């Protein structure tokens, strides 16, 4: 028994001896862990404390840009055609990572102090976005979404963006719209949410009242990001004259145009920047836009702005000084309107496209005036369309005959001393007789100068036949060189007809060339003859101005231009130093002796000053100093219904004129067209030419 008791005690003592060991081992582990923790804390505090503290206090520096006013556009005498008008504005600068619910609350608060006038762009989606930016509404509608719209079939979470769209789809089914007050807040919310981080947008920049400015100024501390500032808009001190040449600028809402957005973004533009969208405003965007201001913003790790520093206050856009004197431009516009009104009163504009005129310095290419009236045949209303001078094409008729005569001499089929040709009609098989406007047999033969004076179609066709090495037998098929179109158009091109002129405006048309072959694949002889006297290919009016300038100056095809110089804006906001000045550009020089040009000039002199009864512009001979000109009348066609391309074609006439003055020292070249008249009996081309020449003389003190 005693032995058993001793064994039990020994066993019990042995079991007790294991307990302190386990406890000690456990305490050791705990001690080791605490020691490791203390060592780690010490390492963090002593070795890396400074770096972690720096991370806590870290900031991020960002560059924020701001827009500046655009440059001005001035006429040749320094008159401001386009400027900028300052106006009060309420702005919003978006902070970093601003949540929708914060903007929702701020938009609601702002409606207490200002009224948004423009709500027509507020879509149903905009209203729903505002509605769901209220956390309570978002939570309520999220709860109504079926689980399948939140969790995918495989158990994964559907992206928040997709869930939000599903929520919108659900709301749309029963959405009845917002109250008027809520729409005000929704419009503000839309602007805020559309802003980029740290960018500034305009909450309201039209018709901001003094009361709105005062109330918002009082509550700026409770309206983070909101400020009272200024904005600018394009102003036109001298009215709408030349608006179609100057072009337009987008609004902040319109922002960058879709057709150039990638290029502009690459240049540093923001999507809501205002840019030139047409003509001079677009062509010279990089000049007029200026340099944005740059502000360095320091942002803390809590995404709050800590400080800001202006690095560059920005530079207003440079200014464009145009070649156009507004006084002359206004005269040309008024004359065009007056004379077109005469055509309307006479019933000659039933199918008319309008009327166009341009004046150019033949020695430099500087545009002196550019005007256009486009006629809406449906409403019978006319509108300003000066750009029709460069982007509308018309068959101009006999006005181009100077180039035909020059081509004949350059080709060697006539010469200054040997240029008399028979003036007999051309008879082709199954084709109406090809002749001039005067009766057959009026002239037995004509010189080049006389042919220009009386506007002989026959003479020009004779030149074409000779250039094409054709043997003409009346009523027989004519074999003509296959390259006749290439040859004739090549001569025309040298003067600018059928070629882009290179004017510093976007959207210039090249012209339209008619077919050169018949259905049988042979040279279209009849069409080649029509081309010779200007009744086939279509040209722009600026091409006619370049062509007559080339005649006037003796062979230099000058590049037309509207911007004479670019001038900086001074620190006081006025004009600063000259940045650049346009130098006249010769695109090509006609390789022909002076005697060739003299032949054509003499013919154009006779058009105005000759004695032949069939002269086409003798009514202008009283203008002194005298000038040279060439009229044109083309057979043209218009659709009876302008809105139906399948409607009946109606025969019309297109009346044109080119000229240069004074004759002995050309300072101005003009081109005029009245397309698709029912009759040219009113001589509208010469009436307008009279006013354009005499007004130029008066304004520039040119006398006999």
What are these model-derived regions, one by one?
Residues 70-74, 223-227, 345-360:
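Short N-terminal helix-loop-first-beta-strand/juxtamembrane motif that initiates sensory/input modules
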Residues 101-108, 112, 214, 218, ...:
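Solvent-exposed, polar/charged alpha-helical surfaces in well-ordered, non-transmembrane soluble domains
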Residues 2-286, 292, 297-305, 312, ...:
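Membrane-proximal periplasmic segments of bacterial cell-envelope enzymes
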Residues 53-65, 328-350:
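Short, basic/aromatic recognition patches
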Residues 578-579, 585, 687-704:
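Short, gly/Ser/Thr-rich active-site loops of penicillin-recognizing serine hydrolases
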């Amino acid at each position: 028994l005693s032995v058993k008791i001793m064994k039990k005690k020994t066993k019990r003592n042995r079991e007790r001896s294991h307990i302190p060991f386990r406890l000690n081992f456990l305490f050791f582990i705990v001690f080791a862990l605490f020691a490791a923790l203390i060592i780690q804390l010490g390492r963090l505090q002593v070795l890396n404390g400074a770096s972690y503290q720096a991370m806590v206090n870290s900031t991020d520096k960002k560059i924020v840009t701001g827009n500046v006013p655009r440059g001005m556009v001035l006429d040749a005498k320094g008159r401001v055609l386009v400027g900028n008008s300052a106006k009060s504005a309420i702005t919003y600068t978006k902070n970093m990572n601003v949540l929708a619910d914060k903007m929702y609350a701020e938009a609601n608060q702002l409606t207490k102090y200002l009224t948004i006038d423009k709500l027509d762009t507020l879509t149903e989606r905009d209203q729903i976005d505002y509605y769901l930016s209220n956390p309570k509404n978002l939570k309520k509608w999220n709860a109504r979404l079926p689980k399948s719209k939140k969790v995918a079939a495989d158990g994964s979470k559907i992206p928040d963006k997709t869930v939000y769209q599903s929520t919108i789809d659900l709301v749309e089914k029963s959405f009845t719209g917002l109250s008027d007050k809520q729409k005000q807040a929704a419009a503000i919310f839309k602007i805020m949410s559309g802003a980029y981080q740290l960018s500034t947008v305009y909450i309201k920049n039209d018709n901001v009242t003094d009361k709105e400015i005062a109330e918002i100024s009082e509550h700026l501390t409770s309206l983070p990001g909101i400020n009272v500032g200024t904005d600018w808009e394009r102003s036109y001190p001298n009215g709408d004259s030349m608006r179609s040449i100057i072009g337009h600028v987008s609004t902040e809402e319109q922002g960058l145009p879709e057709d150039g957005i990638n290029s502009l973004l690459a240049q540093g533009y923001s999507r809501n920047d205002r840019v030139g969208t047409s003509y001079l405003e677009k062509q010279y965007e990089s000049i007029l836009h200026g340099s944005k201001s740059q502000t360095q913003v320091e942002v803390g790790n809590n995404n709050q702005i800590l400080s800001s520093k202006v690095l560059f206050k920005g530079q207003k856009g440079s200014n464009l000084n145009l070649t156009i004197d507004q006084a002359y431009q206004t005269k040309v516009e008024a004359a065009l309107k007056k004379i077109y009104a005469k055509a309307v009163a006479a019933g000659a504009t039933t199918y008319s496209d309008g009327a166009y005129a341009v004046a150019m310095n033949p020695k430099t290419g500087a545009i002196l005036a550019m005007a256009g009236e486009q006629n809406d045949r449906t409403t019978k209303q006319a509108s300003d369309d000066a750009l029709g001078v460069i982007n509308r094409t018309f068959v101009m008729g006999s006005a181009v005959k100077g180039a035909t005569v020059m081509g004949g001499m350059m080709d060697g089929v006539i010469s200054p001393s040997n240029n008399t040709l028979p003036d007999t009609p051309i008879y082709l098989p199954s084709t109406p007789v090809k002749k001039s406007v005067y009766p057959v047999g009026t002239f037995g033969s004509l010189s080049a100068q006389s042919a220009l004076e009386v506007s002989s179609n026959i003479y020009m066709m004779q030149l074409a036949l000779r250039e094409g090495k054709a043997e003409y037998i009346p009523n027989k098929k004519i074999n003509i060189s296959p390259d006749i179109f290439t040859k004739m158009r090549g001569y025309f091109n040298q003067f600018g007809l059928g070629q882009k002129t290179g004017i510093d405006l976007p959207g210039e048309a090249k012209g339209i060339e008619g077919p050169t072959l018949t259905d049988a694949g042979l040279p279209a002889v009849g069409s080649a003859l029509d081309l010779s006297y200007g009744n086939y290919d279509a040209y722009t009016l600026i091409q006619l101005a370049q062509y007559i300038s080339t005649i006037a100056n003796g062979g230099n095809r000058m590049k037309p231009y509207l911007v004479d110089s670019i001038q900086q804006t001074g620190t006081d906001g006025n004009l600063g130093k000259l940045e650049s000045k346009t130098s006249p550009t010769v695109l090509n020089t006609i390789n022909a002796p002076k005697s060739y040009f003299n032949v054509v000039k003499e013919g154009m002199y006779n058009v105005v000053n000759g004695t032949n009864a069939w002269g086409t512009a003798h009514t202008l001979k009283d203008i002194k100093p005298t000038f040279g000109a060439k009229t044109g009348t083309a057979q043209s066609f218009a659709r009876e219904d302008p809105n139906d391309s399948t409607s009946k074609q109606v025969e019309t006439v297109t009346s044109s004129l080119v000229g240069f003055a004074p004759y002995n020292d050309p300072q101005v070249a003009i081109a005029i067209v009245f397309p698709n008249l029912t009759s040219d009996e009113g001589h509208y081309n010469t009436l307008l030419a009279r006013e354009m020449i005499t007004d130029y003389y008066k304004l520039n003190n040119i006398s006999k």
